[in-house]
């Protein structure tokens, strides 16, 4: 109760300027998932509550003021169409309860994406957004190191059924999704290490190494592969001397190689020891392929893949029965889309990702590297993860779309004003 006045003042500040006061803490808490619970349920964590506050404040601002973005990126109607199709799937879903529960999460992410893109951003607030995302990644890796060194070790898996030794992120988003959540912060930090100078370069270089360490701590092979993609794109598109790019590339390769060879504190051990093990993904994908003739055309309903898996597992003798039970995620957003919302849903989702990639590619050279690197890295990780309902996936889509609107606004301000049609300026008469 003593904090009620401060909390009330903060809420008022968020409604007055949501980009400045609500967005940064929300972005920082994204990699922590629902760790800090206030209420039970999918939206009971502090991160989700901040997301609801941010979304409400942005929507009220959009209703009461002029839209900040004069241009709506094509990604917005595409993802709204995906949401609409997922919502309509409730009418034919084989698991309507699961569809309704998952649809709430998807809708909250898409609505927040739309509100962010329609809000007034400039280069300063875009940098604040990116810095907050990077700070969240650094903070969660620091949290993991504290768990390992001061709190008796990593606590193990809480996000779902599982076995094996504990991995960093098991109690947050799940280890593999935790690695994917660090890709956007890694892209921002690595790009700034490449392009900035002095103390800023040193700070962002340290953040880059810490984020890379966090990905190694998760033991995620797909996360490590995606991190390589992020680094490759940053080095390719970043504006910096070739010598600096060569030094950074060599340093990253050497550090990762040393970590995988010597495995200090066990970091990198899982990536090496399980390099040829699919961890059951191929068996799950075989079950999905078995179900495709039934559901790939119209879909089984959003969120219905676990039910499909239970139904089709006995009909897929070549798929091993996993020791963790029969309720599984598809471990690929592409398999998820085609089974749950059919071929139309898969086409819309691929179109949304393609539009985002095209938008990132068309950004000015000085802005292009972080969004492009984060998006490509996320696409690679999403081939192995069904992470479309996670906030970090939509943070990447939002970062690309907001960067597009900022670049478009900057270009419009830079263009000379053109006379209106019918209001031509007469030529000056020559002085005799």
Task: Show which residues each predicted segment covers.
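Alpha-helical transmembrane segments of multi-pass inner-membrane proteins
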Residues: 5-11, 80-91, 107-112, 127-164, ...
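Membrane-interface micro-motifs in multi-pass membrane enzymes
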Residues: 1, 41-50, 101-105, 170-184, ...
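Hydrophobic alpha-helical transmembrane segments
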Residues: 342-354
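Long extracytoplasmic/lumenal interhelical loops at the membrane interface
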Residues: 265-286, 294, 298-341, 363
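Loop-to-helix entry and N-terminal half of a specific, functionally important transmembrane alpha helix
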Residues: 22-27, 328, 332, 359-384, ...
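Membrane-interface helix caps and helix-loop-helix hairpins in membrane proteins
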Residues: 38-42, 91-100, 216-217, 383-388
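Transmembrane signal-anchor hairpin modules in multi-pass inner-membrane enzymes, especially those
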Residues: 1-87, 121-131, 193-202, 248-252, ...
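Juxtamembrane membrane-water interface segments that cap and precede transmembrane helices
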Residues: 32-38, 158-171, 320-335
């Amino acid at each position: 109760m003593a904090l009620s006045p401060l909390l009330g003042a903060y809420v008022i500040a968020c409604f007055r300027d949501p980009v400045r006061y609500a967005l940064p803490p929300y972005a920082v808490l994204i990699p922590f998932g629902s760790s800090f619970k206030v209420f039970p349920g999918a939206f009971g964590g502090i991160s989700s509550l901040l997301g609801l506050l941010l979304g409400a404040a942005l929507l009220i601002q959009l209703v009461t003021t002029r839209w900040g973005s004069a241009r709506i990126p094509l990604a917005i109607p595409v993802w709204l169409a995906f949401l609409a199709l997922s919502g309509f799937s409730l009418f034919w879903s084989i698991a309507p309860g699961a569809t309704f529960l998952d649809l709430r999460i998807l809708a909250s992410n898409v609505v927040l994406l739309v509100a962010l893109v329609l809000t007034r951003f400039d280069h300063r607030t875009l940098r604040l957004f990116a810095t907050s995302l990077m700070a969240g990644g650094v903070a969660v890796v620091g949290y993991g190191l504290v768990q390992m060194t001061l709190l008796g070790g990593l606590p193990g898996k809480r996000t779902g059924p599982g076995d094996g030794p504990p991995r960093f992120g098991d109690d947050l988003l799940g280890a593999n999704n935790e690695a994917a959540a660090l890709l956007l912060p890694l892209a921002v930090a690595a790009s700034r290490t490449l392009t900035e100078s002095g103390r800023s370069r040193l700070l962002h270089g340290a953040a880059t190494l810490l984020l890379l360490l966090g990905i190694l701590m998760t033991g995620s092979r797909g996360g490590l592969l995606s991190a390589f993609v992020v680094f490759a794109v940053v080095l390719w598109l970043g504006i910096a001397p070739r010598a600096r790019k060569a030094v950074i590339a060599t340093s990253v390769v050497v550090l990762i190689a040393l970590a995988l060879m010597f495995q200090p504190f066990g970091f990198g051990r899982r990536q090496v020891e399980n390099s040829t093990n699919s961890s059951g993904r191929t068996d799950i994908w075989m079950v999905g392929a078995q179900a495709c003739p039934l559901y790939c055309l119209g879909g089984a309903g959003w969120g219905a893949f676990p039910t499909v898996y239970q139904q089709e597992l006995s009909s897929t003798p070549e798929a091993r029965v996993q020791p963790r039970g029969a309720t599984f995620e598809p471990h690929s957003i592409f398999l998820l889309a085609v089974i749950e919302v059919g071929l139309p849903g898969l086409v819309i989702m691929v179109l949304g990702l393609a539009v985002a990639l095209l938008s990132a590619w068309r950004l000015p050279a000085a802005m292009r590297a972080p969004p492009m690197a984060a998006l490509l890295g996320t696409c690679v990780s999403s081939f192995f993860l069904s992470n479309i309902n996670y906030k970090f996936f939509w943070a990447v889509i939002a970062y690309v779309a907001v960067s597009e609107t900022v670049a478009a606004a900057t270009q419009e301000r830079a263009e000379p004003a053109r006379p209106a049609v019918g209001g031509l300026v007469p030529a000056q008469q020559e002085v005799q």
